[in-house]
Structures are given as structure tokens and as C-alpha cells.
């Protein structure tokens, strides 16, 4: 069994994905990591050790270090060498294997020039034939920032404002103010903002009202490293000005003039802003009209898609209607087939597309962790090839709390809200694959100008188990009735997108009518 030296999140998903062989027997060894997290300083090197128990040579084993996903990995060592093609781009040239003790089962992952993004959990994974074991190793990253600096500003009311600043801290530091007698007092305001590298810039302000205060110190502490930096400032008595009547009079006059100026600017803004707002609303309305037209034209090419059980991963359970699928912890005993996925928990649709336009919808509901789209019929189904267009996958996914297009560097998708149903439109000749949020018909993402070679098939993948299935929506009975605008670029005239044959009474513009209807999956899975 695997040894987990420190507590962590459930790793059910990673364990399921790693079951890529028909039968994984219990390994004749354990994998043991360090009992405590490894502490590393930004810019320095870190080593994450793990070992086999009992001691045995690991030269003939596959060794894989990975983070949240098995592939791409931080480092893969197989057949006596490192597999750079399977390595995450951010670790290329930085992550190497320390194998001085590999003959005794002792190895370590060395990360050069540690970054803030390296902080977190790593999995040390050993595999021999059909057996594997793993252990978790936690890396904690820290950085001691610059020497703090205090700036002083004397306000008109006689109070003194001090601001203490410093850069380059990780994790977020603590700020503490002290008097010359060691008395502590809190900040009036604090801010901690990360830069592009994840290092925090801290700024803390305090108001000094006690004129007896002579010296004030600012301490910035990194609790993880147990270190702090300090700066002290002396407050001269001459810094406390006296308020005279003429200063008060000037302040009142300036305040009145400021209020009059603000009122004048606001009135002018209100006067000239009404017309541009109307134009923006008109442009936004036409933009929504174009999106609705694009989606409705796509539904004219709706096809009936069903799931192909011969391609389904053994942990995927298909419903009787071949329209719904869910991921389970248990593994089915299925016949070995070349077309079956044995590593990624995926399944293909039965339908094959070699030309034309095709549209279908998938009910994702409120389940998390999925990927859907289109792939080549001959994609690699054995092993952990990355799901990218270069490998024949064109898909979008929900993973963790984010939506992504599965491009080589994974493109984040800033959606207005989580889609409960996703429409997929394939235009083979144009080389376009579009995804729509069927909550409102808006675009999610489009792969454009792709040169397809060979048959394409619908593609579905689940990253986490649960009772809620992924469901393909069936085609509604009867002919589809959608009005198509002859010239979609000419929106100078308001052309309603109402169903043909109905009256032209106004309808709720936010209500979308699809050629596909939702389905309730069967109560039981096969």
C-alpha cells in the first residue's frame, strides 16, 4: 500500500486514472516519503526524496513525479532516461532526478531555482509491470522580502501618518508596529498584493496621535521561516505643526470650491452621457442578435449522438439508452479492445463524421470535472497522451473551479456563469469546432481553421466520480422552425428571430428554443 506521510486531499481521481492496465496487483513494495514537508526558499534548489521499502533497486521501474494531473508530469524516468516529451513546460530544464541511490531504491526530485508556483503537493509514483505504489511529498515555498522602508507624512490636523513598505515576501507576511518601549499597536490599514511571480508586496499604515512618541519601529515577519526584518524611524517634535485660523479658513474655501467643481463635472457628464449610453445599448442588442442567429443556424444541423460502449474506460458506466455516462470507483470486467481507453476515463460517440456540419448538445448540469468535444477516430487510447489539438483532441473542460480550452497551454475561459448544457457545432469543411453556453446561447470557445484528416467522433471525459451523469440531449420530434436572416451582417433593420409560422408578437429575448431537448437518464446503469 502507498504511504502518505502527511494529510492531503482525497486522491480518488488520480488513483482511478492510473488504473490503465486490465488488472493492477498489489505491489511487492511500499513508497515512503519524508514525514514532514520540505521547506525551500525562492531562488534556491529543493530536493524532494522518496524511497522503496524494503530497499530494492529501482533502476528497472517507471518513476513519475506529478502534481494534480498524471500527465503532463513534473518528471518521468523510464527505460533508464528522463522522458522530456511528457514533462510540464514550466519544469523543463529545472526538474531533474537525483539517482545516486537508485540501486537501493532511493531517489529525489531536484527543482532548481524554486518559484512560488512550485508550492504544494507532489506525488512520487513507482510502477513495475502491472503494479504501482505512490507517496505524497509536500513542498512549502518561502521568501524573505526586502528591508522595509518607512515614509512619514504630517497631516494638517497635526496627526502623523507612517507607511511601512517592503517587497518580495512569501507567503503573506505579518506586520507589527512597536514603540521604543516595546509596546505593540495595530496598523490603521494594510495591503498585501502579489506580483507576477506570486511574491507579495506589503504596505501598512498607522496614524500617530501621541505627541510623546519618539521612535516607532515596523516589523515584517515571515512565520514559515521564523525570520523578520525591522526598520525604525524617529519622530522629531518639529513635525507637529500648529493650526492657525487662516489655515482653517483656506481649507474651508478649498473644500467648497472642490464641491462646486465636482457638482459641475457630474452635471456635464450626465448631460453628455445619455446619448452614448443609448448607442451602446443598441450595439449590445445587435451583438446578442448575431450570437442568437449563429446558434440557431447551428441547430439546423442537429444529429443524434449515442455513446460507443466499445471505447468506454472500465470505470465508466453507460446507461441503457447509451445517452448517459457516469464515473464509478469500481472497475468493470470488460473485454480488451484496441479502441477502448485504458488510462484517461473517456468514451467516444458511435457517430463518425468525415464531412458536413453536425450539432449536438450535452447536459452537464451542476456536476464538476468534465471534458467534452471532438477527437480524431484514431487518437491514442492507451497511455496518457496530452489532450491537445496536436494529438487529435479539440475540447473544453471544467476542472477544479475553472473552465479551459484544451489548447497546448490551456486557454482560460472567462464565462459569465456556469453552463448547465453545452452545444457543440462541427463544420468539417470550414475547420471550425464551436462550443455554446445553452443558458443564453453565448459563445464559449471556437477552434478555427483546423485542417482535419480522417474521421472525427464526439468525445466525452469525466474526471471525478459521482451519481450525477453526463447526458447527451436527444433530438426533439417534429421539424425545426427557425427563421434564418438572409444577410446577417446587415443589422441596420431590426429582424426578429421568431419561429416561422407564428405571429410576430414580442417574446422574451432571453428565452432560447433548441432543436434538442433535455433527457432524464434511466434510473439504473448497466
Curated annotation (Swiss-Prot):
InterPro entries with a match to the protein in the record: B30.2/SPRY, B30.2/SPRY_sf, BTN3A2-like_Ig-C, Butyrophylin_SPRY, ConA-like_dom_sf, Ig-like_dom, Ig-like_dom_sf, Ig-like_fold
Highest rank taxon of the organism: Eukaryota
Skewed-composition ranges (Polar residues): 517-526
GO molecular function: signaling receptor activity; signaling receptor binding
Topology in the lipid bilayer: Single-pass type I membrane protein
Region of interest called Disordered, as start-end residue ranges on this chain: 495-526
Keywords: Disulfide bond, Glycoprotein, Immunoglobulin domain, Membrane, Repeat, Secreted, Signal, Transmembrane, Transmembrane helix
GO CC terms: external side of plasma membrane; extracellular space; plasma membrane
Compartment(s): Membrane; Secreted
Single Gene Ontology BP annotation: regulation of cytokine production
Subunit relationships: Seems to associate with xanthine dehydrogenase/oxidase.
Family per similarity comment: Belongs to the immunoglobulin superfamily. BTN/MOG family.
The protein's name in its UniProt record: Butyrophilin subfamily 1 member A1
Organism of this sequence: Homo sapiens
Gene: BTN1A1
Amino acid at each position: 500500500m502507498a504511504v502518505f506521510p502527511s494529510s492531503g486531499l482525497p486522491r480518488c481521481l488520480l488513483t482511478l486514472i492510473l488504473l490503465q492496465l486490465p488488472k493492477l496487483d498489489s505491489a511487492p513494495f511500499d513508497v515512503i516519503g519524508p514525514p514532514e514537508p520540505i521547506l525551500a526558499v525562492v531562488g534556491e534548489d529543493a530536493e524532494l526524496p522518496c524511497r522503496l521499502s524494503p530497499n530494492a533497486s529501482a533502476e528497472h521501474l517507471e518513476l513519475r513525479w506529478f502534481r494534480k494531473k498524471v500527465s503532463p508530469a513534473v518528471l518521468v524516468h523510464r527505460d533508464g532516461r528522463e522522458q522530456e516529451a511528457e514533462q510540464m513546460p514550466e519544469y523543463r530544464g529545472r526538474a531533474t532526478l537525483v539517482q545516486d541511490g537508485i540501486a537501493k531504491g532511493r531517489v529525489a526530485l531536484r527543482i532548481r531555482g524554486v518559484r512560488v508556483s512550485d508550492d504544494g503537493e507532489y506525488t512520487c509514483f513507482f510502477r513495475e509491470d502491472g503494479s504501482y505504489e505512490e507517496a505524497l511529498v509536500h513542498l512549502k515555498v518561502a521568501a524573505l522580502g526586502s528591508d522595509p522602508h518607512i515614509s512619514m507624512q504630517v497631516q494638517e490636523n497635526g496627526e502623523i501618518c507612517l507607511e511601512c513598505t517592503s517587497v518580495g515576501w512569501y507567503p503573506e507576511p505579518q506586520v507589527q508596529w512597536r514603540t521604543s518601549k516595546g509596546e505593540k499597536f495595530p496598523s490603521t490599514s494594510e495591503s498585501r498584493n502579489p506580483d507576477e511571480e506570486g511574491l507579495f508586496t506589503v504596505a501598512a499604515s498607522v496614524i500617530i496621535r501621541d505627541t510623546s512618541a519618539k521612535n516607532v519601529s515596523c516589523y515584517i515577519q515571515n512565520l514559515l521561516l521564523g525570520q523578520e526584518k525591522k526598520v525604525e524611524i524617529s519622530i522629531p517634535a518639529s513635525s507637529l505643526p500648529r493650526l492657525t485660523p487662516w489655515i482653517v479658513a483656506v481649507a474651508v474655501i478649498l473644500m467648497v470650491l472642490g464641491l462646486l467643481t465636482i457638482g459641475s463635472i457630474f452635471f456635464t457628464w450626465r448631460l453628455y452621457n445619455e446619448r452614448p449610453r443609448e448607442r451602446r445599448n443598441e450595439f449590445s442588442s445587435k451583438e446578442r442578435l448575431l450570437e442568437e442567429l449563429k446558434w440557431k443556424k447551428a441547430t439546423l444541423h442537429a444529429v443524434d449522438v449515442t455513446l460507443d460502449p466499445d471505447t468506454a474506460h472500465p470505470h465508466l458506466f453507460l446507461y441503457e439508452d447509451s445517452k448517459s455516462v457516469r464515473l464509478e470507483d469500481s472497475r468493470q470486467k470488460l473485454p480488451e479492445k484496441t479502441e477502448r481507453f485504458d488510462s484517461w476515463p473517456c468514451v467516444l460517440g458511435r457517430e463518425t463524421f468525415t464531412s458536413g456540419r453536425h450539432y449536438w448538445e450535452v447536459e452537464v448540469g451542476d456536476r464538476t470535472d468534465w471534458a467534452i468535444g471532438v477527437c480524431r477516430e484514431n487518437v491514442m487510447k492507451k497511455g496518457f497522451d496530452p489532450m491537445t489539438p496536436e494529438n487529435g483532441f479539440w475540447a473544453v473542460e471544467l476542472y477544479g473551479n475553472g473552465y479551459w480550452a484544451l489548447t497546448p497551454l490551456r486557454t482560460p475561459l472567462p464565462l459569465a456563469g456556469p453552463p448547465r448544457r453545452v452545444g457543440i457545432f462541427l463544420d468539417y469543411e470550414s475547420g471550425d469546432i464551436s462550443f455554446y453556453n445553452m443558458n443564453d446561447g453565448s459563445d464559449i470557445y471556437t477552434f478555427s481553421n483546423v485542417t482535419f484528416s480522417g474521421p472525427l467522433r464526439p468525445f466525452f471525459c469525466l474526471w471525478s466520480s459521482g451519481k450525477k451523469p453526463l447526458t447527451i440531449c436527444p433530438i426533439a420530434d417534429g421539424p425545426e422552425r427557425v427563421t434564418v436572416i438572409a444577410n446577417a451582417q446587415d443589422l441596420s433593420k431590426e429582424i426578429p428571430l421568431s419561429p416561422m409560422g407564428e405571429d410576430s408578437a414580442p417574446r422574451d429575448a432571453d428565452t432560447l428554443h433548441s432543436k434538442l431537448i433535455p433527457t432524464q437518464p434511466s434510473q439504473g446503469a448497466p
